[in-house]
């Protein structure tokens, strides 16, 4: 004869309908997905702004290194070109810093604040689950006495069990109703909450790249040499490189 395990303290009577439990799991599942997506977006936005700042800071560092290059002491044209580049890179870095500050304030911080709500929500769900377990345990206790022979002591214990069950059942039903009412409202509020942030993100990017267009347009006008195409510059570089390789100090043994 095989032994069939059973759950201790579980009621035979279904205390929560499958429809209610299915609705609860669906709504909570949507919020769990929203929590994960919000945290991932916050993390990706932080990585993006950090990378943007690193890029513009590196560009300024390169232009500063070029300014300290000995070539600038000997060639005024080169000095003029590098000075123009350095000015452009500093302007780019300044606008980039403004963009990052704006995104931090209007996008990343709201994402962070929104994410901070989920621990309280998850705790409310845990309290609901604990209330459900208590409800099930006491319901099973009532059923146990209901199945016994109705003697005086049994009826007394049955009455006591029912009295213990009533507030626990009411507590679960209140928690369950509150979550079923408020979880869809919380999920639906995400659109109104995040729309201003995403609009601000788009505006910050548009302003930044509009300024970059102006900055690099000005730089192009300062650096362009009429009559020199990219192919001509490449040929000139190759010619000069060949001359350097022909020097005896760099010739192969």
From Swiss-Prot:
InterPro entries: AH/BAR_dom_sf, BAR_dom, BIN3/RVS161-like, Bin3_BAR. Involved in cytokinesis and septation where it has a role in the localization of F-actin. Its main location: cytoplasm. GO terms for cellular component: actin cytoskeleton; cytoplasm. PANTHER family: BRIDGING INTEGRATOR 3. The keyword Magnesium does not apply. The keyword Repeat does not apply. GO terms for biological process: actin cortical patch localization; cell division; endocytosis; myoblast migration involved in skeletal muscle regeneration; protein localization; regulation of lamellipodium assembly; skeletal muscle fiber development; skeletal muscle tissue regeneration. It is found in: Cytoplasm, Cytoskeleton. Residues 16-57, 120-151 form a coiled coil. Keywords: Cell cycle, Cell division, Coiled coil, Cytoplasm, Cytoskeleton, Septation. Residues 9-232 form the BAR domain. Residues 227-241 have a biased composition (Basic and acidic residues). This is Bridging integrator 3. SMART domains: BAR. Residues 222-241 are annotated as: Disordered. The gene is Bin3.
